[in-house]
């Protein structure tokens, strides 16, 4: 059995940047966001269960999930957010475990799991080590407002729906500081790969 490394962060700390750098280094990575889309595609039982709970208004005209509308609903309503997680998380977990098995069977020794809500979903047991991509809360807020064209209040609502980034950093085996330049972030990623991936 190979090693599984969890990659997480918060809503605008730059986890996607780090994820891309890992994949560019040729290391297999299973993305929970991609898995989450797969398990609620048109025709899946995951989507059917979401429609049963949230209603048909949650669908676009072509019968696919209206992600923007669902996002608005769950960011404002904790109970509905928890219900969505209850529907999707077990399916996402199964998808990711199957992908990991495929990589290990192909001879890979290390697989990354990119999981935005790793701690919130209590998935620490799936991985051997955890990397957290960190920025200051101020940088996180600024980036989210700019990236998603949100007001400060809207951005804070999204950030506050997750565990705080400083709390996540305390739980990590390795923290990547993504508060400054891409070059500095790249160096940290390469250092991690050298220490924990190549030095198996």
From Swiss-Prot:
Residues 4-200 form the DPCK domain. Keywords: ATP-binding, Coenzyme A biosynthesis, Cytoplasm, Kinase, Nucleotide-binding, Transferase. It comes from Listeria innocua serovar 6a (strain ATCC BAA-680 / CLIP 11262). GO terms for cellular component: cytoplasm. Signal peptide: none annotated. Its main location: cytoplasm. Gene3D superfamilies: P-loop containing nucleotide triphosphate hydrolases. It catalyses: 3'-dephospho-CoA + ATP = ADP + CoA + H(+). PROSITE patterns: DPCK. SUPFAM superfamilies: P-loop containing nucleoside triphosphate hydrolases. Pathway: Cofactor biosynthesis; coenzyme A biosynthesis; CoA from (R)-pantothenate: step 5/5. One of its GO terms (molecular function) is dephospho-CoA kinase activity. It is found in: Cytoplasm. The keyword Acetylation does not apply. The keyword Translocase does not apply. GO terms for biological process: coenzyme A biosynthetic process. Its EC number is 2.7.1.24. ATP binds at residues 12-17. PANTHER family: BIFUNCTIONAL COENZYME A SYNTHASE-RELATED, DEPHOSPHO-COA KINASE-RELATED. Belongs to the CoaE family. This is Dephospho-CoA kinase. It holds the Pfam family CoaE.
């Amino acid at each position: 059995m190979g090693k599984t490394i969890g990659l997480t962060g918060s809503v605008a700390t730059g986890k996607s940047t780090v994820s891309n750098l890992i994949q560019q280094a040729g290391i297999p990575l299973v993305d929970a966001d991609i898995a989450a889309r797969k398990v609620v595609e048109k025709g899946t039982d995951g989507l059917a269960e979401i429609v049963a709970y949230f209603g048909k208004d949650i669908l676009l005209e072509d019968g696919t999930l209206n992600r923007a509308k669902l996002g608005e609903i769950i960011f404002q309503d904790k109970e509905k957010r928890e219900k969505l997680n209850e529907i999707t998380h077990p399916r996402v977990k199964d998808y990711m475990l199957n992908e990991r098995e495929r990589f290990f069977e192909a001879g890979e020794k290390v697989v990354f799991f990119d999981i935005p809500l790793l701690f919130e979903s209590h998935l620490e047991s799936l991985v051997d080590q955890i990397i957290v991509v960190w920025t200051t809360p101020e940088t996180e807020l600024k980036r989210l407002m700019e990236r998603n064209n949100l007001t400060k209040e809207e951005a804070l609502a999204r950030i506050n729906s997750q565990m705080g980034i400083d709390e996540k950093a305390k739980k990590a085996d390795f923290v990547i500081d993504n508060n400054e330049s891409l070059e500095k972030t790249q160096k940290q990623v390469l250092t991690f790969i050298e220490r924990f991936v190549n030095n198996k």
